[in-house]
Amino acid sequence: MKFLSFRHEGQTSYGVKVKREEAAWDLKKVFADFAEGSFHPKTLLNGLQQNQVVDFQEQVRKAVVAAEDSGKGEDYKVQFSDIEFLPPVTPTNNVIAFGRNYQDHANELNHEVQRLYVFTKAASSLTGDNSTIPNHKDITDQLDYEGELGIVIGKSGEKIPKGLALDYVYGYTIINDITDRKAQNAQDQAFLSKSLTGGCPVGPYIVTKDELPTPEDVNIVTKVNNDIRQDGNTGQMILKIDELIEEISKYVALHPGDIIATGTPAGVGAGMNPPQFLQPGDEIKVTIDNIGTLTNFIADK
């Protein structure tokens, strides 16, 4: 399943993509009329939280089938052309990112590879697919992109052994880790350079892990104005998904809706000769196999 959150006619909701259509089932409406018992999550995050005791996907499947069989199925759909995409799930706790997890990316920026180079991104930096990111020209002329695979956590845990780590994954998404290279290079920490308003585009979907069985063998392609900048594969990650979860959960308790960014391959603007940073009006597309394409724009003004 591909889950998303959106705004439609001034109201926020969430849904699941309709197969072979550029549309979604509005799950707020579907559950309101066809939920089994009292199961009626108000947001996608609520659904992930309840998934620890109830099979969320199975409840979605049953409710959608009931909506289809009602003869009024179209009343429960929204067209993508009519909605504003929001971040698929707003974490209640953490947006955790691993840096220098691709050797070629570390090399292009002359960074030493460390086993753990971890930082957080402010939740206020989250934005959705097709949104416009402020150009931040008042503080930097070195705005950069980093296309990444994102892990979405599905159940709570800490000190998770590697052998059980994938049990804690609900699904995967796309992240563009927008970075102010000027601040990053001037400071000994990454939080400020990585937490700009609009600096964490996520989406357009969360793809459930059953639909992405080989997340460590998918291509990541980032384009700026249709020019290919990054063309990598998650197989190049130094620490794999189970290792990332094992390492971070030694120190941090993970909860449903937490997002973990797994690092970026080579091809960022700062690594080019000469560097090519994002400019007002630029379009950035990050595509990952079997998830989709995350598109964002840099504001003209």
Curated annotation (Swiss-Prot):
Family: Belongs to the FAH family.
Name assigned to this protein: Uncharacterized protein SSP1806
Record-linked InterPro entries: Fumarylacetoacetase-like_C, Fumarylacetoacetase_C_sf
Entry-linked Pfam families: FAA_hydrolase
Annotated residues for binding of a divalent metal cation: 146, 148, 177
Species for this entry: Staphylococcus saprophyticus subsp. saprophyticus (strain ATCC 15305 / DSM 20229 / NCIMB 8711 / NCTC 7292 / S-41)
The keyword Nuclease appears for this protein: no
Disulfide bridges in this chain: none
Keywords, comma-separated and alphabetical: Metal-binding
Gene Ontology MF annotations: acetylpyruvate hydrolase activity; metal ion binding
Entries under PANTHER family matching the protein: ACYLPYRUVASE, ACYLPYRUVASE FAHD1, MITOCHONDRIAL
